[in-house]
Each structure stands twice: as structure tokens, then as C-alpha cells.
Amino acid sequence: MVARTKLTIGAVGLAIAAVVALDITATSAPTAPAGPTPLSAVPAEALTKVAEANGLPVTEVRRMASGAHFEVDTHQRIRSVEPVPPPQEVAEEAAGPEIPPGTDVFALHSRADSDRTIYLDFTGHSVEGTAWNDGARIDAPAFDGDGNPGEFNDAEREKVYQAFLATAEDYSSFDVDVTTEEPAADDITRDGEDDDVYGTRAVITPEDVTGCGCGGQAYVGVFNDANSHSDYQPAWAYANMDYSGKSIAEIISHETGHNVGLSHDGQGADEYYQGHENWGPIMGAGYYQPVTQWSKGEYSDATSTEDDLSIIPEHGVVTLTDDHADTADGATSLADNESGAGIVATDDDVDVFAFDHTGGPLTVTALPAPYAANLDIRLVIRDASGAEVASVDPPVARVNDDEATGLDAGFAQDLAAGTYTLSVEGVGFGDPAVNGYSGYASIGAYTLTAHSG
């Protein structure tokens, strides 16, 4: 058991979803409500001013106003107010990865050298003087499942670990450190345009401390705000031990997704799309799908076609530069039985490795992230002349709400001695309109091993 100081205020509530904040102050007709008021109640003529106040396209604000889960407050920002799912809709929990021996789950980092941070705060947090609750003090209790506020038991620590893995995978193609270790205040707050070290705090707590009657809240598009960054901290993710680690991560990634400028992915009259077959969008409600990804609305009757992977970098979380060559020229050498690793950062990214095979059986294994992977791998083997020996992309099948098979790729065959190239790329599966997904956001971390003999 790991002792941790927790704020004790009780533990209540379920969580799912997202919030974003925007406030309206109209200085001339048509006037807008002072707030908090449903965005849908704002006169159509006033939405232009709302858009200007938030740096959003007016078409996007109009789309947000067509739903029932955004409101305007008194701080010139928009926030969403998500419905809490009934208990029977909570995702079926599957066994997730265990914590490796010796691992401190409160010192995890996905990219420790990054200047951007997403801090997953499970230990309780107090805020005051911010835009939340008009500056009144808010005391959020720690994530807790056993009523013991003084320490995290093994089950609680496991949820922290799994939520970290899944959130880190969602942001793995971006230059940002997802961490459970509390950073210095300066690593979160941004003080002006010249401050290049900043981020956001996501508070994971079982209690609806903002009184929204919802499952989470976060301001939209404020991750890189240079003028009043601290006013819009933190993001809130309301979750308890009834959620799997993946479901907790879905809330975190959804809420911090609002921070980096994203709105909701719905379908038809539904503001939140729950997905189809094995897939769902992060900015929808993909809690019940084993594969969740960023989206650009390729499914049928999508309410939003915003390009998530372009919008996120516009708000300070830039896409990683390519870590491995895309062709045989400059391919990364891979030694026998040693593991190579990389990130497929974009739909166009292909990572190429070179392997000297001694002849006989050649075995190659490409694995995505070990938990809640976003990357569906295609593995291609070519000989020294560039001729394709094999292309491996197994079908994807659901195991449960948290896991799917077929995201990995493996090869085993007798081949002549020589140098072979092994290519890893992200691909889609099925028809993205109705039962699958494209390669658009089939991105993320992987490991690659090869063995002769």
C-alpha cells in the first residue's frame, strides 16, 4: 500500500463526459445572457460575439448551440454540461494490466522531457480565485474507493496505473508529457506569449465539486492561453472505482480534449456518438468501445467534421516529428531478439527497420500499446530488392469494452539469408461510415521484435 495525503470531503457520484467554459458579455445589441445560461438560449444574432470571445469559428459555436449540453457563464467562455450515464450503462470492466513490481504509480511520465504537461491528479486538489464557481474555493477529494482517505490501496493504485496508460496512449503522437507526478506550478501555468512551458491539470475525483450535476468539466481551447491561463484550471474528471481504468481515461482525454480546442462528436440528433462495432470517438462517448480514437467525423450522419489532429496542435500540443525513416534509405537497424520501439504519429507515417536475417525461420512481431491501444498495425516485410514478401493486417475483433484483438501483427516464415525491411504503419478496419474506422487516427506507440532461427 502507498500512503498518500488526500483531501477528505466525501466521495460521491459517477462521471462521464466533458465540460467547457465560455462566458458572454455583450456590449451592444443584440445582447447575450450574462450566464450561466444554456448556449441554446442565446439569441442567434449574439452567437457571433460568443464566437469572438472564445476564438472559435461562428459555425462551430452555432453547432454547439444546437445541442443541449453547453452553457455560457460570466467569464466569456463556453462550457459543456454532460449527462451522467445511468449505472447500467457503465462499461463492463475487464482485467487490465497489472502494475510492474517497484513501480510508483504517482511518478509516471509518458514524455518527461516535453515542455507541455497533462497532469493526472488523483490525490485531491483545492482551487480558488479561478473562473470555477465564480472564484469560490473548491475542495476536490482524492480518488477513493474504500472510504480510507489516507492512502491508496492496491485496487485504487491499479486504476491510476491503467488510466495513465490509456491517457498516455491517446496523446502518444503529440509532444506532451502525461504524468501522475505533480509538477511545479510553473510547468502548468502559462504567463505570457514568451512562456513555452505550460500545460493543464486534470483532477480525477468522485465528487461533482463544481455542482454541475454532470460527469466532468473543462474549458475549451485554453491549453495555450497566454493571458489568463490559471483562471481556467483545472479540468474536472468525475470518476469512481466503478469505472475501468480505460473508462476513467476516456473521461480524462475527453475533458483535456476540450482544453486543446475540441468540441463534441455526435450523430444525428445525439450530441455524443457512442460508436459502432469496436470503435468510438474520444470526443463522443466511446466508453463501451475497445478502440477509441480522435476523429474527423467519417462515420455516417456525423454532427462534427472538425479535424481533431489539426486542431490539437493549434492549441500548443504539437505533433511529434518522425522518429524513424519512411523508406529503406535510412531504415533503423534492428538487432536479433532486441526490441525496437516507435510512434506512428500521423496517418502518413511509416516506420521502416532493417534486419539482417541469417536464413531459415524469420519471426517478426509488432505490438501496439499494451492497454487501450489507438494504433491498428500493418506489418510489411520486403526483401533487399524491395519486393514485398508479406503484408500482415489481421481482422479486429472485440474481446470486451476495454480490449480488442487484431491490432497487432505477426509474421513467421522460412526465408533466405539477407537484409529485410520491416515496415510498421497504422491502418483502418472495415467501413468507417458504419462499422469501422480509417487510418486517420490509427496512431500511437508500438514495439517491434525480429528473430532469426
Predicted regions and their residues:
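Low-complexity, Pro/Thr/Ser/Gly/Ala-rich linker/spacer regions in secreted
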Residues: 33, 95-96, 100-103, 316-326, ...
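Secretory targeting and sorting signals
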Residues: 1-29
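Acidic/polar, solvent-exposed loop segments in beta-strand-rich repeat domains
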Residues: 131-153, 292-297, 372-373, 430-441
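Acidic, Ser/Thr/Pro-rich low-complexity intrinsically disordered segments
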Residues: 128, 341-452
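Residue-level recognition of alpha-helix boundary/capping or hinge positions
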Residues: 245, 249, 253-255, 260, ...
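Primarily auto-inhibitory N-terminal propeptides
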Residues: 19-146
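Active-site-proximal segment of zinc-dependent metalloprotease catalytic domains
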Residues: 112-116, 123, 130-272
